[in-house]
Amino acid sequence: MKYEIKRNLHGDFSVFEQNKLPARSYFIPFSSEKELEKTDYKSERYLSDRITMLSGEWDFAYYDKLSNIPTVLDTENTSFDKATTPSTWQRTGYDQIAYINTRYPFPKKPPYIPHDVAVGIYRKTVSLNNCARRVITFLGVAGALAVYVNGKYAGYSEGSHNTAEFDITSISKEGENEIVAVVYKWSNGTYLECQDMFRENGIFRDCYIISQGKNYINDFLFRSTKNANSTYNLNIEISGEFSENTSIEIIADGLFKTELSAKMKTKIENLSVKEWSAETPNVYEVLILLKKGAEVCEAVRTYIGFKDVKIDGEVFLFNSKPIKMLGVNHHDTHMTKGYAVSLDDLELDIKLMKEYNCNAVRTSHYPPDPVFLIMCDIYGLYAVDEADIETHGFYAVPYSTYNPNRLSNDVKWASHYLDRVKRMYERDKNHPCVTMWSLGNESGGYKCQDVCYDFLKSVNPEIPVHYEGAIRSKRWAYDVVSRMYGTPDLMRKVLKGTAGSKYKGKPFFQCEYAHAMGNGPGGLEEYMQLFYSSDQFMGGCIWEWADHSVYDENAKYRWTYGGDHNEPIHDGNFCVDGLFYPDRKPSSGALEMKVCYRPVRAQYLGDNKFSLANKKCFTDTSDIEISYIISVNGRAEESGVLDTVIEPMSEKQIEIASPILADKSKDVFVNFIYKDKKTGREIAEEQVIASRIAPSEQMLGKDASFAGAGNTITVTFENGKAIFDKKAGLVSLCKNSVEYLKKDPIDKMNGFVPHIYRGRLDNDQYMVIFWKIIGLDCSKPVLRSCRVVDASGRKCVRTKYDFVTRGIFVLASALVDYYFDDKGNMKITARLEKVCPLTDQLPRFGVHAELNNSFENVEYYGRGPVENYSDFKEHSPIGVYETTVSRMPHKYIKPQDSGNRGEVKEASISSDKAKITFLADKVPFNFNANHFTLGQLSRAKHIEDIPDDKTTFTAIDGFVRGTGSGSCGPIPPREHQIKFGYTHPLEYTFTVKLG
């Protein structure tokens, strides 16, 4: 067939839709109740006898320029490939993969876009039955869409994540029909879709044709209101095409049954219901049966829930309780399919959210597949449903074009904004999970948002409206005050009333916080303590759920990010910022969230008494098994199960009658383990300290024998010796014929060498700029002297290092003193003194050594079993752990410092023949080990860049900076930074035992 393809609509600002049907609720019709009952909410769109599913194989032609399409496209003479939908061009090899954060992919001249855009043409032939009405539905197409049927134009749509529907009754027929979908890469609407993600195009969600009779259901509304006596009234409206002798029967899961006719409206009063919440996701399956006489001619299912949302001054109340939204921001992203996530993919995410103790999700930054919200209804998640609006490119460089309010304060765009908000609302209006509507993200303000806000309050005044961007505009806030990455200090000021008038009088919500990029986020527990400190604080949503990355198991780099695909414009690895890896394996950040979001919290009160607090608002703890393990010096000594139930939002004192708890001479910990009684799944484990003592001072025996000859210092002890080269440091450490040190260290540094830098964390981003200015990132420890001295009444070998950058500048000086006794025990004291005035913010101070690579097995007494830092440790209780050097680091997509174990009192690394043990002296240390050096880590952009050079690189740090969330959020607070100054040198000591 021949088609005259529309060539100007995507650039015509006056047109963002043509012939598109008004937005309505998502549902799937069936011909009968019997057909409906064969399916569930996930399978219904694929199995309904009223649906012709178009997803699957299409003919596909990709044109890199619109001008390359013939004036009249003849599908019979067009060369087509085969493409499977849902999919995107970028993930199927047609267009360049590109990750962009805040920028537009074209020059900013709103509303104008490059006219000659890339276009994808999809063709499919389908057989349709005879019926009275046909509607073609696209659940998601990026960017703009024009639809044709049998050579005729059906309509046009913008708004990638909103449903687009067209009535094709008049241009379709019984039998074979040709469907053509033309997708334009960009349109005027692209100015409203500048979200932080890989920019992709294509039919990325399901599309299908609905076939209906003369009488059909088009839309419905279920709106409940709570009465003073705690019953609910339910208003029901059904719209569609209804002839005489038709009626609607509504059956609500044993709750009620009613029949409508004529106006198709009714009100059911004083229903006694089980309320919906994330803790108690009580949904009622509703069957809507359209009848002609006594015969059902159409059947529809939906789900309803009953909730009451109110704002009382500064307090957000859900079913009369001041809930805490412990949430995440969720993008549609898949490691191979990009935007084209399946319902199984979405359900996996929902299940993981619940497993990791989330109770809320923000659909950043667009409406999701409608079934995602059904899953939120059923599994129990408070949803912040966000409109497909973001104009972040007007915040971005170059600064001469910085104008964040550019579109939002231009009322010419108001109809474009409103269309997206209205379509979100109409599609999702019946979901009990929708706790707030969101007007979009990072688009400035406020005139276009005002129009959208007024619309939402006119149709759904019960549900609060959220928009973070208002905080930087004249509006300040709509129904709640929202911030991104507000610091704990800001929250404390809000509590004190000193943060400013804009933070008063409304609930406070952190729509994004704890930026989870790479290693971290740190500080999550501090946020939790603040959330629970005031009813004004609603909680927040961590940024973000999962890493965005492109996976190819056969490529040089299996996981790629911005810049890896030769794209001219990109924003690097800023997309790799999730709690979960792209394959949904949890990072240590996800483990931290799981513990911090736990529903029960314990506190030791002394005298064997503990307080257990149930942080849930609606349910007691009868579904949770609470057990405990008492450990002494990291090893379990006693355990038990508590027979107790804690009421919602309540605390209860319990007593554990164990004499161990009274022992103040040892480390005594109580680990509380919370499990789901029904499934046995661990909800969380938290550790409470009953007693914690400082490490004892390690005492050495008699001095070893020290001898010097030329450039060599030899220290001799029982069955071994240590050899120092005065120009190289400790070059050999041998006992019982075992050499502990690597003979030719990869970083060309011998012995226990001081360091002050780390493989930069993504969350070090703000500080890295400063560190690079002063040259900290390229500084090297240069050995200045190595000699025998008397110190603290003993002989030692003192090595002095200067940290030199750019060949001449000295940032700091370090002394590393080695004390030996006659048994071969070695005490090391490391001291760092300031030279450069700018080095008051260090990432770490410690020493490292390259051991013989046969040292692989690790045992330690400290925090574990996975990496942890001072502000990132709730997931890592103190204990005795065994692991291997190979398993110590985490394999982040962008390599960075990882694998640190904090609060360590003792650690050992062993081979088949020997063991080296590190003992804390007065204060615990940080311990790490891996098979690559700091230099190799710092140079790597991908994990594949790190060579396997057969070394065991061991670090004993006295001081390690926290992680914070400074890739976008706050840096670690002062107590998790390293305090270093001219009058505050850094010093610590540890002991090494060879055996």
Model-derived segments and spans:
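Catalytic cores of secreted or luminal carbohydrate-active enzymes
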Residues: 196-216, 556-604, 608-610, 615-623, ...
